[in-house]
């Protein structure tokens, strides 16, 4: 799935620091390698009790994927074990991007490779968004800018290769396969006699 060059959405706030990958998708749901269908397990332990009954008081029960495609969370988002299932679950649940002041390195890498945009900004931006749930934002991949309505514009780190892959819905392997002919031609031309 490709990420559009610009996403305009309202935010969904989770004012929690250190949300780890086991909270995003618990280990018992990691038995598949299919990306689709994992949204129902996203934040499962927060949304459902030990009997599988919905926790009606949990704010995630009110999440609206049609208008809230951007998750805002506390710092150190995605810490814990490395699992590609975490960005898969977030994407399948309906999020296109996550805004935080800090991401675990492996989670950030897995997200970029799987089409989920991690938007890392300064604490005061996250604090504003957490204090103003359901706030309109615009994320522009081309300029690596987050626009927070009524608050300002803020740059975020995004390398050009990741931006290229995100906007085309490809990963690193897809990129290599797409350019296989050019790579082979280069290798043939650079061989020493």
Q: Which residues does each predicted region cover?
A:
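Feature captures the catalytic cores and cofactor-binding loops of soluble hydro-lyases/lyases
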Residues: 25, 32-134, 141
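N-terminal, positively charged, Ser/Thr/Ala/Gly-biased leader segments
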Residues: 1-29, 170-193
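Short hydrophobic-aromatic micro-motifs
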Residues: 13, 72, 155-156
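Short, Lys/Arg-enriched charge-dense amphipathic segments
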Residues: 5, 49, 79-83, 147-149, ...
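A generic structural signal for short, non-catalytic loop/turn and secondary-structure boundary residues
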Residues: 4-7, 35, 132, 149-151
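Acidic, glycine-rich flexible loop/linker segments
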Residues: 115-193
């Amino acid at each position: 799935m490709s990420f559009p060059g610009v996403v305009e959405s309202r935010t969904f706030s989770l004012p929690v620091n250190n949300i780890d990958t086991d909270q995003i998708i618990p280990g018992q749901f990691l038995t598949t390698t299919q990306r689709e269908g994992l949204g129902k397990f996203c934040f499962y332990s927060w949304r459902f009790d030990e009997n599988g009954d919905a926790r009606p008081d949990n704010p995630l029960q009110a999440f609206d994927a049609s208008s809230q495609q951007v998750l805002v969370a506390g710092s150190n988002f995605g810490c814990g074990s490395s699992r590609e299932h975490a960005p898969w679950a977030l994407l399948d649940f309906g999020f296109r991007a996550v805004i935080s002041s800090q991401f675990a390195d492996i989670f950030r890498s897995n997200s970029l490779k799987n089409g989920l945009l991690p938007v890392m900004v300064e604490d005061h931006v996250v604090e504003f968004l957490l204090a103003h749930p359901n706030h309109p934002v615009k994320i522009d991949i081309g300029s690596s800018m987050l626009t927070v309505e009524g608050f300002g514009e803020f740059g975020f780190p995004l390398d050009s290769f990741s931006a290229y892959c995100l906007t085309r819905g490809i990963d690193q392997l897809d990129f290599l396969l797409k350019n296989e002919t050019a790579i082979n031609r280069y290798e043939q031309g650079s061989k020493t006699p």
